[in-house]
Amino acid sequence: MICFMFEKRIQCFVILWLFPFGLFSQSEYAGSRLEKIFSKKELVVGVNKQYEPFYIENPKDGFPGVDVEVAKLYADYLGVSLKIVPLKTFRQFSEDIRSGKIDLALAGMSTDLNRGKQVTFSEPYLVTTPAGLVSKKILPPEPEGNIVTSRRFMSLGDLSTLSGLVSFSVRSNTTNHIYLQKKYAKLPIYSYLSDSIAVDNLLSNNVTCFVADSFFILTLLQKNPSLKANYLPLLGSVQEEYISAALPQNDLIFVDNLNFFIKELKRTGVLDDLRSRYFNQNNWVK
């Protein structure tokens, strides 16, 4: 039933916007990447090869990934075909956008000032936050019966009361790493080249809290629900992180077009449905 309702909403959205784009002319977009897209009748989108469920390699039917679904909707909106190009690093995304190998990137990509010097970011289509998976061993025992305690652990900020017990693992040079360095500079912070190594250090009891963005934590729990027995997810917002599309620099026509599209996805509830399908359910997990 949930899947049917989602498909119906998508169909209504596409039908609503399909007709006007038959009226577009390339001359309206002279000098913009949109002119090239309409000329070749194809939208080329870079996606993050290593970040499920934004992109899922060899996916289950009906679950290609959040970013692939958004890209397909945008291609339909423009009235062109879609080509997906899986890439790995921000450098690859920015260079391929600049050279024209891809038109834009939808890659579960968070914005920051340094990245903004190399690409133009769209309005965010998702919002995340630094989040954690903390060992229950260092938390106070659960209240019994009708006992009510004032301390609840909902976000990374709540760990400040356990400073002597907390140590962190995190992927190096990320917004999450920077957040920890500012918030918990006096506590042990171990940074690693990948999230998987950082998770392994939590599971090996080398640290007591793994830190990543909230979507990564939710994905980890969808794939490994048994983790909830020994670890508590801390998903409350401590700092907004914007997930945005990356586009060519100074292409205001292209950015304005995509921003309007994203606003309509938000207004019609399509993005809420996508977030629920991939981060609150595990039907996509292989």
Label for each model-derived stretch:
Residues G46-Y51, P86-F90, L104-D112, S135-K136, ...:
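Beta->alpha turn/N-cap motifs
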Residues V68, K72-D76, R91, E95, ...:
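Solvent-exposed, polar/charged alpha-helical surfaces in well-ordered, non-transmembrane soluble domains
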Residues R91, M109-Q118, Y179-K182, V199-Q239:
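A ligand-binding cleft/hinge motif common to bilobed small-molecule-binding domains
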Residues S27-M109, L113, K117, S191:
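Extracytoplasmic small-molecule ligand-binding "clamshell" domains
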Residues K49, L126-V134, L139-P141, S214-I262, ...:
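Periplasmic-binding protein-like
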